[in-house]
Every structure is written in structure tokens, then in C-alpha cells.
């Protein structure tokens, strides 16, 4: 409603195995490569253009992409592979680097790759202690959505999925070139999520802000 009041035609996309796109028996959030989402984004753009057909001549529209967390990583890679598609990109706390930092990511990459090869759907250790959900609840910003869309401690994650994330982050670290201007939003501070702290309601307790800021300098020339 906020964007519509500003005159935008706002579309929310739930990628495969998330939210409204979840189907019975699926492994929540699992993909073996972030490139798999290209088909989802293409289908969404086709649907948007079909709805706008006939109105485009009267009021041509620019495409502004918005992504958060994993969606921010996914959109960064997609926009770099599809020059000329987006007029601008907005990234809200994009997961451009692993919480271990670049050195830690490189150190564990061989182990993650081996597990992804031999046991892609195995279970990774649980790292979500529920503090993100608690912080949202205390602020009154916890989305009113079906319980199955996001459990309190998140969904289990799998080696194949983590390998896909780390491959995307390695690509970002090597540098990509999004040709559109990119606006990156980050918290000013990071709070470790190992123990609950009231600061989690006003800082980022998921992403290491300084690492994300450094990674963001490698996604384009207008960031």
C-alpha cells in the first residue's frame, strides 16, 4: 500500500519453496544453485508485463528491484547477469558475505562442498536461536503470516543449499558489475546472536554489518 500510494505498481515475489510458493512435501528454501531462481524472476516479470500491456504506452514504467537478505544476494547476482533489465536495485541487508567473513568462508568451503556433493540434503547445525523472531515480537513488527512460512528458529538448512549460498558470495567477492544504481541499506551496528541482548531490537543480529558493507563495494560502480 505504501508503494501504491506513491504511484508505483508493487509486486511481491515469493521465490520457490518460500511463503506462498511453498508446496506440500518440498524442502523449504532449498536450491542447489541460486541460478535456479532465474526462472522464477523471469515468470514474475512476464506476469508483470502482461498486466501492464496496453498501459505501457500511456505511462512507461521503470523496473526497480528490491531484495532482502538471501533475496538481496540473489538479486545482486541476477542483475549482474541481466544488464539493462533494471533501472535501479534496492538491497536491504543483503547477505553478500558469510557471517564468518571472507577468510572463514574460504576455510570451510572445501568441507561444505564435499558435504554438498555426497549429502546435499543432510542437516546443518542449527544456528538460529530464535532471537531474530524475539526481537521482531518485542518491536511489534513480527509479520502476521502462516506459522509454516517461517518457524521461530528458522527452517533447517542443508549442505547443498549452503554451498549454493557460498558460491554466490564467492562470485560477489570476486566482483560483479550491476549496471544500474544500487542503494544498499544496512544497520549501523552488529550484535552477536549467541545470547539474547536488548540491543538486538536496534542492531543487526544476523549479518556482520562491516563485512556486508565491504562486499557491497564489489557489486557495481554506482553503489
Sequence positions of predicted segments:
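Conserved alpha/beta-hydrolase
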Residues: 2-24
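Active-site loop signature of alpha/beta-hydrolase-fold enzymes
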Residues: 18-21, 97, 192
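Alpha/beta-hydrolase active-site loop
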Residues: 30-51
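Alpha/beta-hydrolase fold nucleophile elbow
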Residues: 53-69
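Alpha/beta-hydrolase-fold enzymes
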Residues: 68-70, 74-157
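Active-site nucleophile elbow and catalytic-triad environment of alpha/beta-hydrolase enzymes
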Residues: 153-174
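Short beta-strand/loop motif that positions the catalytic acidic residue
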Residues: 178, 184-186
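Conserved loop-alpha-helix segment in the C-terminal half of the alpha/beta-hydrolase fold
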Residues: 191-223
